[in-house]
């Protein structure tokens, strides 16, 4: 499959604290921000049907960078993290030096680990280039079963394979997925995330058919999502053997939808100022 790694979705409970962490600590930029009056048809915001918002944040254009999607549900002000998400790996000398001067812990391979306000961990390593998201690490209950799903069913190439972990990618230079054998059953709790990829639009239906033939899990069958004032996007939502959610979108519509909005951070800050949901829920 000619797929492209796009982003990972986090549910966040406090937008003000979260945006400060990502912009001031990880030095990311707000790329676009969207507000919605009701829940997403493809459960983009989780199992909620109230008002919500989506903020894309990262180190550059979504055409060229793997970024993050921060989902905020107005009625929800706390999520419980499970053991499904492990970490996101970012390398940069500049960022490494900065993190070394603030509260952190040392992780494996010489990286420094920090957490966002909701507890999502990031591992920062040294590299002579601007900050870049290199890898998403997810825990799995059965490494062989997961490897077979991602490699054989979804077509991700194996980059490196070790006894307790496998690194996969849809192509050179793309953000990798690293699946890591967990010593316990995967419990995603309420703070579960979602990883997203794009495919040429005409390949989405064949992908869905392939998953059905293999008796794989389809959370949302192929549908078209509308964003007010922006491009429509086709999506199909899958789940791997550990129920990690996987979104595949039509690449053509998504490239149009995902253009950088220079006014996004200003709009987000204004929405944060107006948000009085804690008084109501």
From Swiss-Prot:
Residues 4-127, 132-251 form the VOC domain. One of its GO terms (biological process) is methylglyoxal metabolic process. It comes from the Eukaryota. Keywords: Repeat. It holds the Pfam family Glyoxalase. Belongs to the glyoxalase I family. Thought to act as a glyoxalase. May remove methylglyoxal from mitochondrial proteins. Has roles in reducing oxidative stress and increasing lifespan. This is Glyoxalase 1. It comes from Caenorhabditis briggsae.
């Amino acid at each position: 499959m000619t797929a492209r790694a796009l982003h990972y979705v986090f549910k966040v409970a406090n937008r003000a604290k979260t945006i400060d962490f990502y912009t001031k600590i990880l030095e990311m930029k707000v790329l676009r921000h969207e507000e919605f009056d009701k829940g997403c048809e493809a459960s983009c915001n989780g199992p909620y049907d109230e008002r919500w918002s989506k903020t894309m944040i990262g180190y550059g254009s979504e055409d060229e960078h793997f970024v993050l999607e921060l989902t905020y549900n107005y009625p929800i002000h706390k999520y419980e993290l499970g053991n499904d998400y492990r970490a996101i790996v970012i390398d940069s000398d500049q960022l490494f030096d900065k993190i070394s001067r603030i509260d952190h812990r040392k992780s494996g391979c010489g990286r420094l680990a920090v957490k966002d306000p909701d507890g999502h961990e990031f591992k920062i390593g040294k590299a002579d280039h601007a900050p870049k998201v290199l890898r998403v690490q997810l825990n799995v209950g059965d490494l062989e079963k997961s490897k077979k799903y991602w490699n054989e069913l979804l077509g991700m190439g194996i980059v490196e394979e070790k006894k307790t972990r496998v690194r996969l990618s849809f192509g050179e230079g793309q953000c990798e997925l690293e699946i890591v054998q967990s010593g316990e059953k995967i419990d995603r709790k309420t703070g579960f995330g979602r990883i997203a990829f794009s495919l040429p639009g005409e390949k989405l239906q064949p992908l869905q058919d392939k998953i059905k033939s293999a008796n794989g899990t389809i959370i949302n069958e192929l549908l078209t999502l509308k964003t007010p004032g922006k491009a429509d996007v086709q999506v199909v939502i899958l789940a791997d053997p550990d129920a990690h959610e996987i979104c595949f979108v039509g690449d053509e519509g998504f490239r149009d939808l995902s253009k950088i909005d220079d006014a996004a951070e200003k709009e987000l800050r204004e929405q944060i100022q107006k948000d009085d949901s804690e008084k109501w829920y």
